[in-house]
Protein backbone atom coordinates (compact mmCIF):
# COMPACT_ATOMS: atom_id res chain seq x y z
CA UNK A 1 0.00 0.00 0.00
CA UNK A 2 1.42 3.38 -1.02
CA UNK A 3 2.15 6.07 1.53
CA UNK A 4 -0.39 8.49 0.01
CA UNK A 5 -3.11 5.83 -0.04
CA UNK A 6 -2.37 4.82 3.56
CA UNK A 7 -2.45 8.45 4.64
CA UNK A 8 -5.78 9.00 2.90
CA UNK A 9 -7.31 5.95 4.58
CA UNK A 10 -5.99 7.09 7.95
CA UNK A 11 -7.43 10.56 7.39
CA UNK A 12 -10.85 9.18 6.44
CA UNK A 13 -10.77 6.93 9.48
CA UNK A 14 -9.97 9.80 11.81
CA UNK A 15 -12.68 11.96 10.24
CA UNK A 16 -15.23 9.19 10.68
CA UNK A 17 -14.26 8.73 14.31
CA UNK A 18 -14.44 12.48 14.82
CA UNK A 19 -17.96 12.69 13.37
CA UNK A 20 -19.07 9.74 15.46
CA UNK A 21 -17.67 11.40 18.54
CA UNK A 22 -19.59 14.59 17.72
CA UNK A 23 -22.81 12.65 17.36
CA UNK A 24 -22.18 10.90 20.64
CA UNK A 25 -21.39 14.22 22.33
CA UNK A 26 -24.70 15.68 21.18
CA UNK A 27 -26.75 12.93 22.80
CA UNK A 28 -24.58 11.64 25.60
CA UNK A 29 -25.38 11.93 29.28
CA UNK A 30 -23.68 14.79 31.11
CA UNK A 31 -22.00 14.16 34.46
CA UNK A 32 -21.93 17.91 35.08
CA UNK A 33 -23.66 20.72 33.24
CA UNK A 34 -23.65 24.40 32.38
CA UNK A 35 -27.15 25.89 32.25
CA UNK A 36 -28.18 29.36 31.13
CA UNK A 37 -31.36 30.95 32.50
CA UNK A 38 -33.13 33.88 30.88
CA UNK A 39 -36.01 35.30 32.93
CA UNK A 40 -38.32 37.90 31.44
CA UNK A 41 -39.24 39.81 34.61
CA UNK A 42 -38.63 39.96 38.33
CA UNK A 43 -41.71 38.92 40.28
CA UNK A 44 -42.68 36.17 42.69
CA UNK A 45 -44.31 33.78 40.20
CA UNK A 46 -41.34 33.69 37.83
CA UNK A 47 -38.92 33.58 40.76
CA UNK A 48 -40.81 30.57 42.13
CA UNK A 49 -40.61 28.86 38.72
CA UNK A 50 -36.84 29.37 38.68
CA UNK A 51 -36.53 27.95 42.20
CA UNK A 52 -38.54 24.88 41.24
CA UNK A 53 -36.34 24.36 38.17
CA UNK A 54 -33.11 24.49 40.19
CA UNK A 55 -34.63 22.13 42.78
CA UNK A 56 -35.49 19.55 40.13
CA UNK A 57 -31.99 19.75 38.67
CA UNK A 58 -30.52 19.08 42.12
CA UNK A 59 -32.83 16.13 42.62
CA UNK A 60 -31.68 14.83 39.25
CA UNK A 61 -28.02 14.96 40.25
CA UNK A 62 -27.07 18.43 39.01
CA UNK A 63 -26.33 20.47 42.12
CA UNK A 64 -25.33 24.11 41.85
CA UNK A 65 -21.75 24.68 42.94
CA UNK A 66 -20.87 21.00 42.47
CA UNK A 67 -22.06 19.45 39.22
CA UNK A 68 -24.00 22.47 37.94
CA UNK A 69 -22.94 25.93 36.82
CA UNK A 70 -25.78 28.41 36.29
CA UNK A 71 -25.65 31.73 34.44
CA UNK A 72 -28.79 33.83 34.96
CA UNK A 73 -30.00 36.86 33.03
CA UNK A 74 -33.12 38.91 33.89
CA UNK A 75 -34.69 41.31 31.37
CA UNK A 76 -36.59 43.19 34.11
CA UNK A 77 -39.73 43.16 31.96
CA UNK A 78 -38.07 44.98 29.06
CA UNK A 79 -38.23 43.03 25.79
CA UNK A 80 -35.48 45.23 24.35
CA UNK A 81 -33.03 43.54 26.74
CA UNK A 82 -33.80 40.00 25.62
CA UNK A 83 -31.78 39.84 22.39
CA UNK A 84 -28.57 40.97 24.10
CA UNK A 85 -29.09 38.49 26.92
CA UNK A 86 -29.69 35.63 24.51
CA UNK A 87 -26.46 36.54 22.70
CA UNK A 88 -24.64 36.32 26.05
CA UNK A 89 -25.92 32.76 26.58
CA UNK A 90 -25.95 31.38 23.02
CA UNK A 91 -23.58 28.48 22.39
CA UNK A 92 -22.06 28.64 25.87
CA UNK A 93 -24.20 26.12 27.77
CA UNK A 94 -25.32 22.51 27.67
CA UNK A 95 -28.93 23.67 28.08
CA UNK A 96 -30.81 26.95 28.34
CA UNK A 97 -33.96 27.67 30.35
CA UNK A 98 -36.44 30.43 29.45
CA UNK A 99 -38.98 31.77 31.93
CA UNK A 100 -42.08 33.39 30.31
CA UNK A 101 -43.17 33.61 26.69
CA UNK A 102 -41.10 36.65 25.54
CA UNK A 103 -37.93 35.06 26.94
CA UNK A 104 -38.66 31.72 25.26
CA UNK A 105 -39.36 33.37 21.89
CA UNK A 106 -36.15 35.41 22.09
CA UNK A 107 -34.15 32.32 23.02
CA UNK A 108 -35.56 30.29 20.13
CA UNK A 109 -34.82 33.09 17.67
CA UNK A 110 -31.28 33.62 18.96
CA UNK A 111 -30.02 30.09 19.66
CA UNK A 112 -31.53 27.10 17.89
CA UNK A 113 -28.50 24.86 18.49
CA UNK A 114 -28.55 24.59 22.28
CA UNK A 115 -31.30 22.37 23.77
CA UNK A 116 -33.79 24.51 25.68
CA UNK A 117 -36.64 24.24 28.16
CA UNK A 118 -39.29 26.86 28.94
CA UNK A 119 -41.88 27.49 31.64
CA UNK A 120 -44.53 30.12 32.45
CA UNK A 121 -45.71 29.96 28.83
CA UNK A 122 -49.47 29.71 28.24
CA UNK A 123 -49.69 28.66 24.59
CA UNK A 124 -46.33 27.54 23.16
CA UNK A 125 -47.92 26.44 19.88
CA UNK A 126 -49.39 29.90 19.13
CA UNK A 127 -46.13 31.45 20.32
CA UNK A 128 -44.25 29.41 17.70
CA UNK A 129 -42.14 27.52 20.22
CA UNK A 130 -43.26 23.94 19.49
CA UNK A 131 -45.17 22.03 16.83
CA UNK A 132 -47.58 20.56 19.37
CA UNK A 133 -47.76 19.83 23.09
CA UNK A 134 -47.51 16.08 22.50
CA UNK A 135 -44.65 16.28 19.99
CA UNK A 136 -42.62 19.51 20.31
CA UNK A 137 -40.59 18.50 17.26
CA UNK A 138 -37.64 20.87 17.68
CA UNK A 139 -34.89 21.60 20.16
CA UNK A 140 -37.21 23.03 22.82
CA UNK A 141 -39.85 21.71 25.23
CA UNK A 142 -41.12 22.81 28.62
CA UNK A 143 -44.09 23.30 30.93
CA UNK A 144 -47.10 25.58 30.52
CA UNK A 145 -49.08 27.76 32.89
CA UNK A 146 -52.35 27.50 30.96
CA UNK A 147 -55.33 27.68 33.26
CA UNK A 148 -58.94 26.59 32.93
CA UNK A 149 -60.27 30.04 32.08
CA UNK A 150 -63.90 28.91 31.81
CA UNK A 151 -63.56 27.38 35.27
CA UNK A 152 -62.09 30.63 36.58
CA UNK A 153 -65.03 32.61 35.21
CA UNK A 154 -67.46 30.16 36.84
CA UNK A 155 -65.67 30.79 40.12
CA UNK A 156 -65.70 34.56 39.61
CA UNK A 157 -69.47 34.66 38.97
CA UNK A 158 -70.17 32.49 42.01
CA UNK A 159 -67.99 34.64 44.24
CA UNK A 160 -69.29 37.92 42.79
CA UNK A 161 -72.91 37.30 41.71
CA UNK A 162 -73.69 41.02 41.85
CA UNK A 163 -71.24 41.82 39.04
CA UNK A 164 -72.98 42.78 35.78
CA UNK A 165 -70.02 44.39 34.00
CA UNK A 166 -66.60 42.75 34.24
CA UNK A 167 -63.36 44.39 33.20
CA UNK A 168 -60.36 42.56 31.76
CA UNK A 169 -56.92 44.14 32.02
CA UNK A 170 -53.60 42.95 30.58
CA UNK A 171 -50.56 43.76 28.44
CA UNK A 172 -51.60 43.26 24.81
CA UNK A 173 -48.02 42.52 23.72
CA UNK A 174 -47.92 39.31 25.77
CA UNK A 175 -49.24 36.35 23.78
CA UNK A 176 -50.13 34.32 26.86
CA UNK A 177 -52.24 37.16 28.27
CA UNK A 178 -54.03 37.66 24.96
CA UNK A 179 -55.03 33.98 24.81
CA UNK A 180 -56.51 34.01 28.32
CA UNK A 181 -58.21 37.38 27.89
CA UNK A 182 -60.03 36.22 24.76
CA UNK A 183 -61.14 33.02 26.49
CA UNK A 184 -62.34 34.99 29.53
CA UNK A 185 -64.31 37.44 27.36
CA UNK A 186 -66.00 34.55 25.58
CA UNK A 187 -66.88 32.81 28.86
CA UNK A 188 -68.27 36.01 30.40
CA UNK A 189 -70.39 36.81 27.35
CA UNK A 190 -71.83 33.29 27.46
CA UNK A 191 -73.14 34.24 30.90
CA UNK A 192 -74.74 37.38 29.43
CA UNK A 193 -72.37 39.68 31.27
CA UNK A 194 -71.02 42.90 29.80
CA UNK A 195 -67.26 42.91 29.24
CA UNK A 196 -64.92 45.90 29.07
CA UNK A 197 -61.37 45.18 27.94
CA UNK A 198 -58.50 47.58 28.64
CA UNK A 199 -54.88 46.95 27.69
CA UNK A 200 -51.44 48.49 28.06
CA UNK A 201 -48.06 47.86 26.45
CA UNK A 202 -45.81 49.30 29.16
CA UNK A 203 -45.91 49.64 32.94
CA UNK A 204 -46.04 53.44 32.53
CA UNK A 205 -49.68 53.28 31.43
CA UNK A 206 -50.96 50.97 34.16
CA UNK A 207 -52.14 53.58 36.67
CA UNK A 208 -54.12 55.67 34.19
CA UNK A 209 -55.71 52.74 32.33
CA UNK A 210 -56.55 50.73 35.44
CA UNK A 211 -58.10 53.78 37.13
CA UNK A 212 -60.31 54.31 34.09
CA UNK A 213 -61.34 50.64 34.06
CA UNK A 214 -62.09 50.50 37.79
CA UNK A 215 -64.53 53.39 37.44
CA UNK A 216 -66.58 51.59 34.78
CA UNK A 217 -66.98 48.01 36.03
CA UNK A 218 -68.36 45.93 38.90
CA UNK A 219 -65.46 43.44 38.95
CA UNK A 220 -62.10 42.87 37.25
CA UNK A 221 -60.47 39.73 35.84
CA UNK A 222 -56.68 39.70 35.50
CA UNK A 223 -55.12 36.95 33.33
CA UNK A 224 -51.59 35.67 33.86
CA UNK A 225 -49.51 38.68 32.86
CA UNK A 226 -45.99 39.84 33.69
CA UNK A 227 -46.91 43.54 33.58
CA UNK A 228 -49.79 42.98 36.00
CA UNK A 229 -47.51 41.03 38.33
CA UNK A 230 -44.81 43.69 38.33
CA UNK A 231 -47.31 46.51 39.04
CA UNK A 232 -49.47 44.61 41.53
CA UNK A 233 -49.06 47.23 44.25
CA UNK A 234 -50.37 50.02 42.01
CA UNK A 235 -53.28 47.92 40.75
CA UNK A 236 -54.22 46.84 44.25
CA UNK A 237 -54.33 50.42 45.54
CA UNK A 238 -56.58 51.50 42.66
CA UNK A 239 -59.01 48.59 43.07
CA UNK A 240 -59.18 49.02 46.83
CA UNK A 241 -59.89 52.75 46.56
CA UNK A 242 -62.57 52.13 43.94
CA UNK A 243 -63.94 49.23 46.03
CA UNK A 244 -63.94 46.93 43.00
CA UNK A 245 -63.50 43.20 43.70
CA UNK A 246 -61.17 41.33 41.38
CA UNK A 247 -59.85 37.91 40.49
CA UNK A 248 -56.34 37.07 39.34
CA UNK A 249 -54.94 34.07 37.50
CA UNK A 250 -51.63 34.27 39.33
CA UNK A 251 -50.94 34.32 43.06
CA UNK A 252 -47.97 36.58 42.31
CA UNK A 253 -50.48 39.41 42.51
CA UNK A 254 -52.67 38.14 45.33
CA UNK A 255 -51.89 41.38 47.19
CA UNK A 256 -53.68 43.32 44.43
CA UNK A 257 -56.89 41.31 44.17
CA UNK A 258 -59.68 39.75 46.21
CA UNK A 259 -58.69 36.21 45.24
CA UNK A 260 -56.66 34.20 42.75
CA UNK A 261 -57.15 30.87 41.02
CA UNK A 262 -54.21 29.62 39.03
CA UNK A 263 -51.20 27.40 38.74
CA UNK A 264 -48.45 26.68 41.24
CA UNK A 265 -45.43 28.29 39.57
CA UNK A 266 -42.85 26.47 41.62
CA UNK A 267 -44.50 23.21 40.57
CA UNK A 268 -44.39 24.00 36.84
CA UNK A 269 -40.80 25.17 37.22
CA UNK A 270 -40.05 21.80 38.74
CA UNK A 271 -41.76 20.06 35.81
CA UNK A 272 -39.46 21.95 33.45
CA UNK A 273 -36.48 21.03 35.60
CA UNK A 274 -37.29 17.33 35.33
CA UNK A 275 -37.42 17.70 31.56
CA UNK A 276 -34.05 19.45 31.65
CA UNK A 277 -32.57 16.54 33.60
CA UNK A 278 -33.86 14.11 30.97
CA UNK A 279 -32.28 16.21 28.21
CA UNK A 280 -28.96 16.47 30.04
CA UNK A 281 -29.01 12.69 30.37
CA UNK A 282 -29.34 12.27 26.62
CA UNK A 283 -33.02 12.58 25.68
CA UNK A 284 -34.09 14.79 22.78
CA UNK A 285 -36.38 17.78 23.52
CA UNK A 286 -38.30 16.93 20.34
CA UNK A 287 -39.72 13.80 21.97
CA UNK A 288 -40.51 15.17 25.45
CA UNK A 289 -44.16 16.18 25.86
CA UNK A 290 -44.85 19.70 27.07
CA UNK A 291 -45.98 19.36 30.69
CA UNK A 292 -49.31 20.75 31.90
CA UNK A 293 -50.15 22.09 35.39
CA UNK A 294 -51.36 19.36 37.69
CA UNK A 295 -53.89 21.35 39.73
CA UNK A 296 -55.14 24.92 40.15
CA UNK A 297 -55.05 26.49 43.59
CA UNK A 298 -57.26 29.18 45.13
CA UNK A 299 -55.97 31.87 47.47
CA UNK A 300 -57.93 34.70 49.11
CA UNK A 301 -56.60 38.10 50.17
CA UNK A 302 -58.17 38.51 53.62
CA UNK A 303 -57.15 42.18 53.86
CA UNK A 304 -58.79 43.01 50.54
CA UNK A 305 -61.92 41.08 51.52
CA UNK A 306 -62.15 43.10 54.73
CA UNK A 307 -61.66 46.39 52.85
CA UNK A 308 -64.45 45.43 50.44
CA UNK A 309 -66.74 44.17 53.21
CA UNK A 310 -66.75 40.61 51.86
CA UNK A 311 -66.57 37.18 53.50
CA UNK A 312 -63.20 35.61 52.65
CA UNK A 313 -64.21 32.25 54.12
CA UNK A 314 -67.18 32.01 51.76
CA UNK A 315 -64.86 32.50 48.78
CA UNK A 316 -62.40 29.92 50.11
CA UNK A 317 -65.25 27.44 50.43
CA UNK A 318 -65.94 27.73 46.69
CA UNK A 319 -62.60 26.11 45.98
CA UNK A 320 -63.28 22.98 48.00
Regions found by a protein language model. Name each.
Residues 32-60, 71-80, 173, 227-230:
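Extracytoplasmic "Venus flytrap"
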Residues 278-320:
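Hinge/cleft segment of the Venus flytrap/periplasmic-binding protein
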Residues 23-25:
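Bacterial signal peptide processing site
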Residues 53, 141-188, 289-304:
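An alpha-beta-alpha
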Residues 17-21:
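C-terminal motif of bacterial Sec signal peptides marking the signal peptidase cleavage site
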Residues 69-90, 199-213:
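Structural motif
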Residues 75-131, 225-240, 244-248:
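Beta-alpha junction/loop-to-helix N-cap segments that form part of ligand/metal-binding clefts
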Residues 124-163, 263-283:
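Hydrophobic alpha-helical segments within soluble ligand-binding/sensing domains
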Amino acid sequence: MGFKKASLIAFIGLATLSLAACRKEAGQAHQSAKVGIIQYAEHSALDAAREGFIEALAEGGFKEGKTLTVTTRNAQGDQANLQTMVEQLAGKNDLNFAIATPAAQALLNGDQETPAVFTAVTDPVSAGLVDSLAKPGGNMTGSIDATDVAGQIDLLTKALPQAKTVGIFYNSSEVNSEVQAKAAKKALEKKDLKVLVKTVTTTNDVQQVMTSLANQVDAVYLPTDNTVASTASTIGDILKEAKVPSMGSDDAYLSAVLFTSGVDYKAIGKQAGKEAVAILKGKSPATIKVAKPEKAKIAVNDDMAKALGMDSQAIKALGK
